[in-house]
Each structure stands twice: as structure tokens, then as C-alpha cells.
């Protein structure tokens, strides 16, 4: 039950975040995020790539019975760690709090996925 709730929250968050990065449908948030990416020395293409990784992870984490689940969780963990690094390097630690939360939740899902995969092979 807990895993389903965490996956639902992560998936909803990253589906929203990736849709904005990929399509720019929410103009104000898109422009704010693009300005942050540019302040980190990254361009629109990098932002689009992050959006693709987030979309893959948000969908992949639902497939916990296969290797796709842990791979999706690892993708979300990687983007969260990258966001934490950028916020700690260029902003304040407070700006990185959402990424710290998503990193912890992604690590939980990844841990659960790996333990279910290991039980198949042992």
C-alpha cells in the first residue's frame, strides 16, 4: 500500500514536471524553469532531455514486476540528484528541498524494486 502511494505521488509530480519541460504548456512555470536551467549553464535542449528522462521514470515506476520499474526509479533518482547538485551549487539549499524529497522517494521505490527483482533470482 505504501509503495503504491509513493509511486502515485512520484508519477503525478514527474508527469506534471515533464509535461511542462517538454511542451511548455504552463508558460510561467516553463519560463521560470528555463531561466533556472540557463543560469546553470544549460540550454533548452538539456531541459527537454531532462523532461524525457522524467517522463520515462514517471511511467516506468509503475512496472515494478519487471526491470522497467527499478530503471524508472533510477531515472527519477538521477534527475533528483542532478537537481540537488544544481541547487546546492547555484542556488540555496532551500531551493533543493523538493528535489531532496523526490530523491528520497525515488530511492525508496528503487530499493523496493531491487529487492523484488533479487527475490526472483535467488
Where are these regions (language model features)?
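Membrane-interface extramembranous regions
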Residues: 1-122
Amino acid at each position: 500500500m505504501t509503495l503504491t502511494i509513493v509511486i502515485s505521488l512520484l508519477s503525478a509530480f514527474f508527469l506534471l514536471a515533464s509535461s511542462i519541460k517538454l511542451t511548455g504548456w504552463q508558460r510561467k512555470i516553463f519560463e521560470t524553469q528555463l531561466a533556472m536551467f540557463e543560469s546553470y549553464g544549460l540550454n533548452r535542449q538539456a531541459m527537454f532531455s531532462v523532461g524525457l528522462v522524467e517522463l520515462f521514470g514517471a511511467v516506468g515506476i509503475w512496472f515494478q514486476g519487471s526491470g522497467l520499474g527499478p530503471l524508472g526509479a533510477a531515472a527519477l533518482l538521477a534527475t533528483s540528484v542532478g537537481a540537488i547538485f544544481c541547487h546546492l551549487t547555484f542556488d540555496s539549499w532551500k531551493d533543493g528541498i523538493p528535489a531532496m524529497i523526490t530523491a528520497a522517494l525515488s530511492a525508496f521505490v528503487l530499493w523496493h524494486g531491487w529487492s523484488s527483482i533479487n527475490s526472483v533470482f535467488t
